């Protein structure tokens, strides 16, 4: 095929052939200034290998949460050359909060996967794939030259042979004839070593054959009288060391104590003192960063109260009879939402400059996942009933554990609740999740005997089901007096479920 052709045509026809009716420019100038020729002019143009190759559509690493700085490519859901429509899923991206599906914004063909699945720490805005429009030759797409090479997919490090560790020999023992027949007291041992004497030169007079301090002093007197001589072992040349060893490590007493084993080289298998580095996921790094910032910058104050669940448990049993299944935690969420509606001064956040009053009560509920703790949000919880809250918690908890939460389902919130009661914890204090001002930590409910009065005023013992709740509050926004009144109101609402209607 010839490399070029000569085409004679008029201006409107040439515009049509060159595709200026499409949405993409082919690299030629547009407008009247670009067409300074009249009818019948002669044009030279190249065939499709040069002219019809349009710029590809770039797929960039998106920002899927306010705190996201990097992302990991978990899995590509489409293959190169596969047609996609707007809204189709392209890949799964692990953010600092969850695993989110990235959807296509345009119709076209996935032409080039730039960043392979499994790649980690991809910066926001980095090129991860290229697409072309339908009908274009996707095989001809090349990665732009200004794009840096994608980071390599992290692979587990190959096992390496441990480097030989310098062997530190134990101090040489002095040989003492018959030492095995004697059990030396500590004082006797020191005296014998100091005067270079051997216990076999004397007689043990202590209980159970122990060579005592007095026995050692008798040997010293005999030595001074010249009746016995020093007992020194023949000196042996010091062993050669492959590495420099401190002098104190080569010299020791005649009766050495066990030496502390040296710390081994990190990564050396099956050696004392070794450790294994655990790769931190994006979620774990963000959790560590935010909790550290919270404890170091937010002045935490704590208030604790015991709540009687007797009435709640009775209502719950009545609901079960009507096949309505709700948990104690659902009642706690509802009670917190009602209390926040009654006391809007607690439904605030701190943005660094001052408090912000929030119009909606959005409660973040802590959910434990394999990758860490995440807090999906019950939006406008004060306007929802118990059963509606229970349904929302079930759906969001499942999505959180499956890593399918959307960013809007865990970003924001005005108040947090963390419940460890199912793990048998009586009470604990939780760390505030900035910019929120408070978090409520809930323990397990437990039976407690309390002395009460019957209708006639007679004292009697009754069993009560109590839970302990501890509220951590930001003292910059919620002072101790306000936190105390909030807990009092919360306790009253929870112990009287009729108030939660």
UniProtKB/Swiss-Prot annotation:
UniProt keyword list: Acetylation, Lipoyl, Mitochondrion, Phosphoprotein, Transit peptide
Post-translational note: Delipoylated at Lys-97 by SIRT4, delipoylation decreases the PHD complex activity.
GO cellular component entries: acetyltransferase complex; mitochondrial matrix; mitochondrion; nucleoplasm; plasma membrane; pyruvate dehydrogenase complex
Source superkingdom: Eukaryota
Pfam annotation, one family: Biotin_lipoyl
Main location: mitochondrion
Modified residues (Phosphoserine): 196
Domain Lipoyl-binding: 56-132
InterPro entries: 2-oxoA_DH_lipoyl-BS, 2-oxoacid_DH_actylTfrase, Biotin_lipoyl, CAT-like_dom_sf, E2/Pdx1, E3-bd_dom_sf, PSBD, Single_hybrid_motif
Modified residues (N6-lipoyllysine): 97
Record text on subunit structure and interactions: Part of the inner core of the multimeric pyruvate dehydrogenase complex that is composed of about 48 DLAT and 12 PDHX molecules. This core binds multiple copies of pyruvate dehydrogenase (subunits PDH1A and PDHB, E1), dihydrolipoamide acetyltransferase (DLAT, E2) and lipoamide dehydrogenase (DLD, E3). Interacts with SIRT4. Interacts with DLD.
Name listed for the protein in its UniProt record: Pyruvate dehydrogenase protein X component, mitochondrial
Gene (name only): Pdhx
